[in-house]
């Protein structure tokens, strides 16, 4: 599933029209249609922020939306790029993970440890 299909499913689940989305981001409904049909790439990060707020997405929905946009663009969201570039430790961590190609189970354990540290 690409960004457009994911977004369409999410929009329909929230019972929101393409026109409502277009109004929120101050664009034409045709753009929303083109994004959903894969004729255009994902919305800009600025537009995504407006959409996330308007749709009142859960954290999981928001995370998935940004992930699908990043996959479609072939690059990380701007704020993640800035964080990684600014923090050598974050860069090293990602470099180490990529080099060692850890499996899902190991990555899930690392995520759980990080979340536990943040919540403490």
Predicted regions and their residues:
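A short, Lys/Arg-rich alpha-helix, primarily the initiator
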Residues: 1-13, 107
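Conserved hydrophobic/aromatic packing and binding residues within compact polymer-binding modules
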Residues: 7, 11, 21-22, 32-35
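Short alpha-helical "recognition helix" segments of helix-turn-helix
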Residues: 19-22, 51
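Recognition helix of helix-turn-helix/homeodomain-like DNA-binding domains
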Residues: 26-42
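DNA major-groove recognition helix of helix-turn-helix/homeodomain DNA-binding modules
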Residues: 43-64
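Interfacial/linker helices and their anchor residues that mediate assembly or domain coupling
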Residues: 70-120
């Amino acid at each position: 599933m690409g960004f457009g299909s994911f977004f369409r499913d999410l929009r329909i689940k929230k019972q929101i029209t393409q026109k409502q989305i277009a109004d929120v981001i101050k664009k034409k409904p045709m753009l929303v249609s083109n994004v959903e049909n894969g004729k255009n790439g994902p919305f800009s990060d600025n537009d995504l922020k407006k959409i996330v707020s308007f749709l009142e997405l859960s954290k999981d929905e928001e995370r998935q939306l940004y992930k699908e946009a990043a996959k479609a663009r072939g690059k990380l969201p701007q704020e993640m790029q800035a964080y990684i570039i600014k923090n050598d430790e974050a860069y090293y961590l990602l470099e180490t993970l990529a080099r060692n190609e850890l499996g899902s189970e190991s990555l899930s354990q690392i995520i759980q440890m990080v979340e536990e540290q943040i919540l403490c």
